[in-house]
Amino acid sequence: MREENKTYITHLKVTDVPWHRLTTAYGRGTEFPAHLAVLEQMGDLASVKESLYELTANMEHQSTLWHATPFGMVFLSRILEKALKESGKNPVAYFLAGELLDFFACILQCFHDGDEMEHAEPLPLFSDLLKEGNLWSEEYDEEEDEMRYEEDEAFPDDLFYSFYYFSWQACLLYTSPSPRD
């Protein structure tokens, strides 16, 4: 992994991401920060289940990953680390860790399947996903978004493959031994 990408992933904050301009399976990632906060707290099981469902359903649908997915994976990776550390004393953390491990397996399978096919090269930098030309409109308009999807190239090939590649990279960084511990 390129050093710039490691640094970017490691230092990325939820507030650095324009979630409202990133596509998901069912719209935009506007609500991601609130759902990530619920998971981070690992408090109420019902709330954790609801937020986990909202995130995972919007990050992956029928093996398709979306613009918000790599960014979601950065934060879910951090949450998984925390959940694993707390799983011995917090039943919600234990539940969440198991569910996240299953979801990560799904994301990694999506990457593997896509990587087996002919594909474009990924964007050079994770941060390139947030370049102005790669973001969707500032204001969400469901009809406008649907029309863009109906076009042949809703996403350029390199951008689309980058959804998969950088989702994998986010997982990879957090599965490697690190000096953070």
Feature map (PLM): residue ranges:
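N-terminal "cap/leader" segments of large eukaryotic alpha-helical scaffolds
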Residues: 2-45
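Boundary/linker elements of alpha-helical solenoid repeat scaffolds
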Residues: 12-23, 36, 55-64, 151-164
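HEAT/HEAT-like alpha-solenoid repeats
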Residues: 36-41, 77-81, 85
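HEAT-repeat alpha-solenoid elements in large eukaryotic scaffold proteins
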Residues: 48-56
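Positions within ordered alpha-helical repeat solenoids
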Residues: 57, 61, 78, 82, ...
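Short sequence/structural elements of tandem HEAT/ARM alpha-solenoid repeats
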Residues: 67-74, 116-121
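Acidic, serine/threonine- and proline-enriched intrinsically disordered linkers and terminal tails
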Residues: 106-173
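Conserved small/polar residues in nucleotide/adenosyl-binding loops
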Residues: 174-181
